Amino acid sequence: MGMPISKAVIPAAGLGTRFLPATKAMPKEMLPVVDKPAIQYVVEEAVNAGLHDVLMITGRNKNALENHFDRATEIEAQLEKKGDTRRLQEILHSTHLANMHYVRQLDPRGLGHAVLRSQMHVGQESFAVLLGDDLIDPRDALLERMIEIHDTHFASVVALMEVDPSQTHLYGIATVEETDESDVVRITGLVEKPDPKDAPSSLAVIGRYVLQPDIL
């Protein structure tokens, strides 16, 4: 049996052009969702699954990501002086959430290259990859289940979701075989954004992966 999975990789080097003009001066991962930035939900998801060692793959103009998970002593002092305990605890929560590490993707060569930048950090351990473009309801406990499947089958695990067959041209679509488990299929192929008439299924890849180290 391999080592327990403890590391998460979060690629966050993209330019966020789909969200312009909102992302002209702000990383898309820092866009607020209710009361905190989107990236914090992703890190919290990793931590809730037991992954406290988080490597973020960043790029130019992404300093706000590191700053968000760092101390802000001036703000802390001001909140403490005001007696604003609630907000003080909220910003301290993000600071102590995980053991955060950062590596830059120097050239924008896509997702595979970004994940490859994690090689020295993850070493010979299996690891999770979480994409910030997809926010998962924590009540689904998706990542926990994926880790369980990985540990049972000793294989890499990719999250899939059922999409409307007319929308397959927007996703990577999997060719699958059924297994004895109702929530597990065996992926035999992947097709990137197929025309609906050519799609092998309506099961789309979403941004959660549990990968064995040999993929690097």
Predicted regions and their residues:
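N-terminal glycine-rich phosphate-binding loop and ensuing alpha1 helix
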Residues: G2-E80, P108, A141-R145
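Short glycine/proline-enriched turns and hinge-like loops at secondary-structure junctions
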Residues: A22-T23, T168-H169, S201-S202
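Conserved beta-strand segments of alpha/beta enzyme cores
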Residues: E29, N99-H101, R186
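Structural signal for conserved beta-strand scaffold positions within catalytic alpha/beta enzyme cores
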Residues: P32, Y102-R104, V158, G189-E192
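Well-ordered alpha-helical segments embedded in enzymatic catalytic cores
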Residues: A38-Y41, H113-R117, G189
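Conserved beta-loop-beta/alpha segment of the NTase-like Rossmann-fold superfamily
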Residues: E74-Q78, T85-E178, L211-P213
